[in-house]
């Protein structure tokens, strides 16, 4: 299997950039969060889920589906629905690597709805970058490729992460 060429520092830079955009309420219609390192995927998914909609809107306009329990047609149908009493509908697809017919999501990602935000969490491996699904996500949304840090990168990343939380740590 070919390596993607993305390094851990690239993952951290993309993660920080996306966090800044989300904090500024600049949302993409599609988020593809993929890769071997689940921390960044889960953190961005949680941030998006808690930021896009107000608490009162989530009951009607935020849906979470799991890849093993669904298929691409159902996800596309959910994404094509209109939001109820809100400006956005959020569809979170977790465990997308187990979704039947993942490439059929390209029907949606090639022309996403302006009122729906689709968040695709694809863990354990990357989506095929040659697929129409990936190309639609990259062209019409945001893609985070999350790679595992090498052993020598962990200490510096932990220090930075803990510093951002307002604490200090000594090596």
Model-derived regions: residue spans:
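P-loop (Walker A) phosphate-binding loop of NTP-binding proteins
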Residues: 36
């Amino acid at each position: 299997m070919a390596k993607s060429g993305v390094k851990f520092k690239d993952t951290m830079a993309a993660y920080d950039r996306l966090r800044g955009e989300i904090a500024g309420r600049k949302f993409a219609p599609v988020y593809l969060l993929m890769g071997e390192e689940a921390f960044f995927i889960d953190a961005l998914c949680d941030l998006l889920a808690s930021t896009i909609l107000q608490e009162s809107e989530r009951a009607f306009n935020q849906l979470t589906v799991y890849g093993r329990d669904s298929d691409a047609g159902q996800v596309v149908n959910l994404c094509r629905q209109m939001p109820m009493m809100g400006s956005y509908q959020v569809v979170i697809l977790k465990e997308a690597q187990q979704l039947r017919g993942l490439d059929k999501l390209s029907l949606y990602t090639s022309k996403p709805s302006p009122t729906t935000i689709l968040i695709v969490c694809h863990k354990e491996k990357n989506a095929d970058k040659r697929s129409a699904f990936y190309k639609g996500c990259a062209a019409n949304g945001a893609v985070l490729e999350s790679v595992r840090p090498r052993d020598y990168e962990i200490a510096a990343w932990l220090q930075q992460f803990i510093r951002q939380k307002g604490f200090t740590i000594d090596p």
